[in-house]
């Protein structure tokens, strides 16, 4: 790709019991004024392990380029795990680069709040997870977003109780 090229990667990984899901992305800037973004979301439950491996490289002639990386993990229980392995290689000094990573756990308070409004625990958990992946789902065509929500709900079956 040449000058002013743009790239975007969106990924969702779901790690259930006995699973280790490893997602990742690579963005390589080789020309000036290029832009890229990576957004990765992972969900782990039942002792599942979710990982993200990402690489961003900005070559010496890729002046005035920009990249953002955002990795978010949601742990549904206390026995699941998430790991992030970013690799950043910048070979020029007039670029913008941002990297954020968060790991959060579904809290008892979140569940209590929704359940106190009459929602069953399994539906409350599913709503929290759907809210977590919503930033990616809204970027997808409607039929893919619906399929993603169905897959998440299938993966969440049996997560409560």
In which residue ranges do the predicted regions lie?
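Small/polar glycine-rich anion-binding or flexible loop at a beta-alpha turn
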Residues: 107, 127-134
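Conserved beta-strand/loop scaffold segments within soluble protein domains that form the structured core
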Residues: 1-119, 137-161
